């Protein structure tokens, strides 16, 4: 696989950068107008950093057995673990970036059932142990780009989605793959309270074209940093599609269904003019409310010292995936 442009040491997110001290915040308030250029959701998340010195404590996941294929040992500089497990979008547990780590401990991941159905010859079901033992696991270092114009680099652990789909034997009628998150309002407060959950319709649903789902980069993810996923990152299994914006990475999946028609997707249903079905990372197609030309790679020194870097087409994976969209107008099909 072609090497992807490495980030520099200056891009690394330092351990001390994630939450600002109260004293730093007081100094920062005098020039906080700079934050107003960020997306509205990001502005709210910056305010959540002001709540105190203590960062949320992520549950410790069990160690996983996995390989580290040479093809995925990228030169990319990793975002530290506490950033990835402490700065999340998972509206089922609240709108602020710190809410999932603070609230997702209520999520019950054992037992778990993942059903594969629809336009397949051999539908089947995976249980909790199957998720980490049915298919060989491997670590892959991927860029992660949020539609809010911030990014991370994460060592995910999982298996290619095509292995799961191939075992189900898709029929000739299968054109798309539909995903669905667990619906458990008692464990996921955002599903019960529209104010907590951002007014979205739950359960969260996502979808891919079948060829996108079968691409070797598309990963069913069960771990991060050598351990099982913590709840706030989508335990026990989530989707990672590294050339797409992060909201395509549906979490805590209970259903994968192959379909003839394009499935509905949560953010597209909520705001179709802002969030398309494809959601490919594209610096030339702005969000209606902010630019996608650059991104914030959270760095040392806190929120006021974050450096911006150019956004890469398909998040740096163009050589692998651009052929999937040959002849497709990416501005119209965003």
UniProtKB/Swiss-Prot annotation:
<comment type="function">
    <text>Part of the MsrPQ system that repairs oxidized periplasmic proteins containing methionine sulfoxide residues (Met-O), using respiratory chain electrons. Thus protects these proteins from oxidative-stress damage caused by reactive species of oxygen and chlorine generated by the host defense mechanisms. MsrPQ is essential for the maintenance of envelope integrity under bleach stress, rescuing a wide series of structurally unrelated periplasmic proteins from methionine oxidation, including the primary periplasmic chaperone SurA and the lipoprotein Pal.</text>
</comment>
<feature type="binding site">
    <location>
        <position position="233"/>
    </location>
    <ligand>
        <name>Mo-molybdopterin</name>
    </ligand>
</feature>
<dbReference type="GO" id="GO:0046872">
    <property type="term" value="F:metal ion binding"/>
</dbReference>
<keyword id="KW-0560">Oxidoreductase</keyword>
<dbReference type="Pfam" id="PF00174">
    <property type="entry name" value="Oxidored_molyb"/>
</dbReference>
<dbReference type="InterPro" id="IPR036374">
    <property type="entry name" value="OxRdtase_Mopterin-bd_sf"/>
</dbReference>
<comment type="similarity">
    <text>Belongs to the MsrP family.</text>
</comment>
<keyword id="KW-0479">Metal-binding</keyword>
<dbReference type="InterPro" id="IPR022867">
    <property type="entry name" value="MsrP"/>
</dbReference>
<keyword id="KW-0574">Periplasm</keyword>
<dbReference type="GO" id="GO:0016672">
    <property type="term" value="F:oxidoreductase activity, acting on a sulfur group of donors, quinone or similar compound as acceptor"/>
</dbReference>
<feature type="binding site">
    <location>
        <position position="88"/>
    </location>
    <ligand>
        <name>Mo-molybdopterin</name>
    </ligand>
</feature>
<dbReference type="GO" id="GO:0030091">
    <property type="term" value="P:protein repair"/>
</dbReference>
<feature type="binding site">
    <location>
        <position position="181"/>
    </location>
    <ligand>
        <name>Mo-molybdopterin</name>
    </ligand>
</feature>
<feature type="signal peptide" description="Tat-type signal">
    <location>
        <begin position="1"/>
        <end position="44"/>
    </location>
</feature>
<keyword id="KW-0732">Signal</keyword>
<comment type="subunit">
    <text>Heterodimer of a catalytic subunit (MsrP) and a heme-binding subunit (MsrQ).</text>
</comment>
<feature type="binding site">
    <location>
        <begin position="91"/>
        <end position="92"/>
    </location>
    <ligand>
        <name>Mo-molybdopterin</name>
    </ligand>
</feature>
<keyword id="KW-0500">Molybdenum</keyword>
<dbReference type="GO" id="GO:0042597">
    <property type="term" value="C:periplasmic space"/>
</dbReference>
<dbReference type="InterPro" id="IPR006311">
    <property type="entry name" value="TAT_signal"/>
</dbReference>
<feature type="binding site">
    <location>
        <begin position="249"/>
        <end position="251"/>
    </location>
    <ligand>
        <name>Mo-molybdopterin</name>
    </ligand>
</feature>
<dbReference type="GO" id="GO:0043546">
    <property type="term" value="F:molybdopterin cofactor binding"/>
</dbReference>
<protein>
    <recommendedName>
        <fullName>Protein-methionine-sulfoxide reductase catalytic subunit MsrP</fullName>
        <ecNumber>1.8.5.-</ecNumber>
    </recommendedName>
</protein>
<feature type="binding site">
    <location>
        <position position="238"/>
    </location>
    <ligand>
        <name>Mo-molybdopterin</name>
    </ligand>
</feature>
<feature type="binding site">
    <location>
        <position position="146"/>
    </location>
    <ligand>
        <name>Mo-molybdopterin</name>
    </ligand>
</feature>
<dbReference type="InterPro" id="IPR000572">
    <property type="entry name" value="OxRdtase_Mopterin-bd_dom"/>
</dbReference>
């Amino acid at each position: 696989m072609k090497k992807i442009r490495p980030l520099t040491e200056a891009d690394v997110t330092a351990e001390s950068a994630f939450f600002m001290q109260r004293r730093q915040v007081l100094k920062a308030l005098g020039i906080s107008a700079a934050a107003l250029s960020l997306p509205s959701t990001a502005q709210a998340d910056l305010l959540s950093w002001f709540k105190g010195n203590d960062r949320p404590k992520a549950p410790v996941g069990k160690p996983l057995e996995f390989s580290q294929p040479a093809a995925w040992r990228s030169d990319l500089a990793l975002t530290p673990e506490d950033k990835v497990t402490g700065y999340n979008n998972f509206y089922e547990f609240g709108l602020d970036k710190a809410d999932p780590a603070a609230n997702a401990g209520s999520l019950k991941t054992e037992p778990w059932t993942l059903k594969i159905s629809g336009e397949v010859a051999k539908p089947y079901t995976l249980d909790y142990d199957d998720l980490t033992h049915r298919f060989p696991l491997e670590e892959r270092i991927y860029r992660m780009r949020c539609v809010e114009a911030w990014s991370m680099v994460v060592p995910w652990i999982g298996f290619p989605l095509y292995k799961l789909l191939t075992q189900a034997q898709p029929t000739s009628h299968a054109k798309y793959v539909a995903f669905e998150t667990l619906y458990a309002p008692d464990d996921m407060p955002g599903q019960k309270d529209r104010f907590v959950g951002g007014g979205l319709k739950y359960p969260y649903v996502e979808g891919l074209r079948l060829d996108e789902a079968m691409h070797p980069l598309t990963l069913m993810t069960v771990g991060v940093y050598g351990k099982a996923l913590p709840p706030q990152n989508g335990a026990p299994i989530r989707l990672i599609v590294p050339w797409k914006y992060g909201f395509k990475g549906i979490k805590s999946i209970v259903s994968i269904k192959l379909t003839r028609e394009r499935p509905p997707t949560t953010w597209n249903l909520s705001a179709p003019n802002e969030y398309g079905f494809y959601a490919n990372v594209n610096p030339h197609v702005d969000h209606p409310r902010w630019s996608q030309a650059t991104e914030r790679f959270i760095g040392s020194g806190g929120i006021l010292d974050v450096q911006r870097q150019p956004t890469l087409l398909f998040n740096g994976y163009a050589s692998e995936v651009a052929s999937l969209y040959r002849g497709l107008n990416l501005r119209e099909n965003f």
